[in-house]
């Protein structure tokens, strides 16, 4: 039996489906899905891993023996030498407090004193997927050969190498081969398995070097920043060798913006049109002096044209220019283009991975921008036309013309640029997937098409002796723009005018303006800047940016640093500037590239990185108090939402020690007891300027961002008139009417929780109450539900009016569930509750077993 090891379950299934002539049989080994099939008359089985099956970590301590020197001991009793420098103190120690032990140092707990030892502690690999490893070994015992078919890059080669090491524990003599492919098309997979190669151990070692270096740097720096401020693990402050200089780029740009001194300038602009033309045919005109830096000169010129109604055409100039088609997509350029379409780099990679696994696009983590000669471009275009009717006309033109693909600056031999495979069914894709797939498909076609021709018409006008200009671009020859309209400006057609013609002018105004500071990075631009500075890799840049958002060092898009992010970079720049510079990170990445090429060893590169980190840590430990104070001030600044209306001190976001829920409290506590509730399930941020203070009650106003919903602004004071909704009668109580009494159904809003509901005025007698959606203006209709007799109301939301029966147990809910709600019977709810409890208990047990041997150091590693 031939054992084929893929990186994920979907990949295992795809490979089995592509290689077999029939349909693979899905089976299980223990609880792991596998796929059995025949290939070239031989029984085969594919198994998909879950990414890395081994995770790097540290032992609990480093110990010292006079004969053996420094070492660590694994759970299996294996002794690993630790290259602790002679300058660090050895036992016996003068103190018995943690982290000091009788025979060494504990590195399991988070203590500043242990960090110099942690820097040099040996790295071990623990099972991250025990069930998968068990299944893998079971299959290996029954196999006569192994094929590694993980992704062909550093991470994929390392995953394959780790899996192979586990296989060799039970079958050390199995022949091993490697399948390298760039897409899940039948032709590509078949070719890869017909032309097997050897596992590239240098590539795997380079991947492991990065893995170990990022663990060591992330663990040491994260623990240091956390301990400098908090003295414990509860409020982790993340850092890493790539993450920190990336944050420094954003902070550096913000400092440039803060230091920017705006300069005044003036512009004279208006509108023009051919005489008698419709209002829609007007065009923009501006004084030939685009910016007046002298106010008097601007006012003098404006005085000449103020009130002018006509102008004379002094000259008409037409010029054509060619716009060249774009180069093929690499990972960074795809992320930048997708960001311009509103898809973040991290989401782009998640979607691209799903499209790749579905066989719709080629491998998405690439640097290459040159199509290889082996790629049949014409065949891809033909296949694309068959599965994508909307692109069929463009595909036909591409096939009819000379196909000369563009070339980028980077050419590699591992994978081709990102392109659509021409297989699969794009019509089944959801919104985000379809958007990204179209971007890839259209970019691919654009790289095979000719340039676009744009004609510019420039008008020079005389307005009462003052020179004005107008300009417009028109797409004359679409070229590649027929396939790739992204970023194309709307045509600005100038009227057919000649020298000496008279045009009408309107609304000429003098505008005072100021120069703008450098723009903040968009996420797409930040990815490009990281690539330019040598920060991260094509596979890690998006996740690094996502991590910086997750730990609240960054906010918004365009990217803005938080006060905490600024404080950390300012402090690190002052006390350990090398860590914030891209140079050291770029140097380490260069070392890993040399390992990949076989020019250096993993051991040497990791040791070199430890030495660099030791120097950084030595400087930081001298300034722990100053750095901790800076972080503390920044944390308070980020948590501030406004001034307390009672005592004037800061109101800040706080977390309840009992409930772990968020609330707003005064920094003057316990002398000032002002607190405000915070809506649940939202991300809160302060407002700026006049909007930051409520005009009605003087309390702060905040911005609330629900998950995947439109943000809203509220006053934090729940009793404020701006939050108050007058009671609204929506109907009469049916239960009370049947009991011979009158009861009104009134819509209320709870001052304490902010929740809305409908309740009968005789609630104590009838118990009638209905929940309402949290947001949306409520309107009574005076109608009742024909099924249950409850009131019908209209809730006006951002997506339009929503007409509902307020009774959540109404039979109409069974027919057509209300948007965003799901009605269940008490019996089904009880079943689900019981099942949920069992599932939760099982998950907790599994989680405990899986993580029992993992230390908190792994959680601390910031960079991937």
Regions found by a protein language model. Give the residues of each.
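Short glycine-centered, acidic/aromatic-flanked micro-motifs in structured strand/loop junctions
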Residues: 150-152, 336-338, 365
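Amphipathic alpha-helical transducer elements in NTP-driven molecular machines
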Residues: 9-16, 43, 98, 104, ...
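Intrinsically disordered, low-complexity regulatory segments
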Residues: 1-217, 506
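C-terminal or mid-to-C-terminal helical accessory/interaction module adjacent to the motor/catalytic core
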Residues: 142, 184-270, 319
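Short, polar/flexible loop-turn hinges at active-site or ligand-entry regions and domain interfaces
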Residues: 124, 150-152, 170-177, 197-204, ...
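Long, highly charged, low-complexity internal segments
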Residues: 39-47, 51-125, 234-353, 357, ...
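Basic, low-complexity terminal or inter-domain segments flanking catalytic cores
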Residues: 2-3, 35, 166, 222, ...
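Short, charge-patterned binding micro-sites
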Residues: 185-187, 362, 368
